[in-house]
Amino acid sequence: MAEERDAEGTEALIAELHKKIKDAFEVFDHESNNTVDVREIGTIIRSLGCCPTEGELHDFIAEIEEEEPTGYIRFEKFIPVMTRALVERRYRPAAEDILLRAFEVLDPAKRGFLTKDELVKYMTEEGEPFSQEEMEEMLSAAIDPESNTINYRDYITMMVVDEN
């Protein structure tokens, strides 16, 4: 009896995930032919609350991209892989305390902020570098226009995804 209830709950969860995935995919299916441009996949995945690295995104796309013609992703290939990623809670965003520690490493003087120039340097020259577009998007959300700095505690609070 309890097993039946669990199975029904799982089926309901999967159905709900499929609807969310379909809704997100359809936003980018401009031809209404169940395909999207491969360049939109990262946006779709992130709109579903996932935060893959560029490497993880590349692997995800390699698993589902059409062989001929390349550059497109079919919904039928996308939905099982995306469903599995959501069920397994892959590509979770970093926790607030981890983000704070990362910013504190970049701020050895413990000022509580980084200048715009410091932020741009770190985000475009270190680790997995941001693209120009990603950097502009981050700056528009993060930088205080009056001081030209980012108060990283405020920024982290604003950016952290609520898991509930």
From Swiss-Prot:
**Record's keyword annotation contains Plastid:** no
InterPro entries recorded for this chain?
Answer: EF-hand-dom_pair (IPR011992), EF_hand_dom (IPR002048)
Instruction: Indicate the principal place this protein occupies in or around the cell.
Output: cytoplasm
**GO CC terms for this protein?**
cytoplasm; cytoskeleton; sperm principal piece
**Protein family per UniProt:** Belongs to the DRC8 family.
Q: How does it assemble?
A: Component of the nexin-dynein regulatory complex (N-DRC).
Protein name per UniProt: Dynein regulatory complex protein 8
This chain's source organism reads Mus musculus
What gene, per UniProt, encodes this protein? Efcab2
